[in-house]
């Protein structure tokens, strides 16, 4: 079974990329298509580990530098942004896994997985919670993320992010319940076995400036 957007991965490293995404997703206990969707849109539809945005974030999930620094801290280790941008796909997928691994087994939807990528402090918060913290004010986050402007009052709430995401939900992901995906093994683009995952996931396009809160 093909993963979401796997045909968009550059052919030169597609097979190895997909295999590694599946391996990572099994460890994280998530649907590998969620991770594929995040990387596709975060990298501006390129799956390039060197893709940069306008405010210094780089890579497959747009790693953002720590505030005022030239490095990104992940699980206590500092990674120079210049080094992250030079990583090949395999090296950076290892970093992607390191970023998510503390949430292994806790991500029950695409929305959960996206909030880990976008603003972890928002995970588990009520829909009316104003997104802020981590050294960033609500106003700063608002200005950096116009895609989520619903009320347009200088702040972004959790429900505004969800609403934007749901606007781009593909019809095949609308069904709730347990979905069976073939992810046990991957050989010559043939995946066999099953992984039980929670559906009701979402896709959306997001390629605005990031707030650096990851």
Residue spans for each PLM region:
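Intrinsically disordered, highly charged
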Residues: 1-23, 27-29, 167-185, 208-214
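Active-site or metal-binding loop neighborhoods of secreted/extracellular toxin and effector enzymes
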Residues: 136-187
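Catalytic glycan-binding domains that act on GlcNAc-containing polysaccharides
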Residues: 2-149, 153, 161
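Single-pass alpha-helical membrane anchors
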Residues: 183-213
């Amino acid at each position: 079974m093909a993963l979401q957007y796997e045909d968009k991965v550059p052919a030169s490293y597609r097979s190895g990329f997909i295999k590694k995404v599946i391996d990572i997703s099994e460890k994280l206990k998530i649907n590998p298509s969620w991770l594929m969707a995040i990387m596709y849109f975060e990298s501006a539809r390129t799956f390039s580990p060197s893709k940069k945005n306008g405010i210094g974030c780089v890579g497959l999930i747009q790693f953002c530098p720590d505030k005022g620094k030239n490095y990104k801290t992940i699980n206590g280790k500092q990674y120079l942004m210049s080094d992250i941008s030079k990583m090949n796909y395999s090296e950076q997928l290892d970093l992607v896994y390191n970023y998510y691994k503390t949430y292994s087994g806790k991500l029950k939807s695409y929305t959960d997985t996206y909030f880990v990528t976008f603003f972890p402090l928002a995970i588990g918060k009520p829909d009316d919670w104003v997104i802020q913290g981590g050294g960033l004010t609500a106003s700063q986050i608002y200005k950096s993320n116009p895609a989520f402007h619903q009320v347009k009052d200088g702040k972004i709430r959790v429900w505004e992010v969800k609403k934007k995401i749901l606007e781009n939900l593909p019809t095949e992901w609308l069904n709730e319940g347990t979905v069976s995906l073939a992810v046990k093994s991957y050989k010559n683009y043939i995946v066999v076995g099953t992984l039980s995952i929670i559906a009701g996931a979402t896709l959306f396009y997001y390629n605005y400036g990031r707030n650096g809160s990851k």
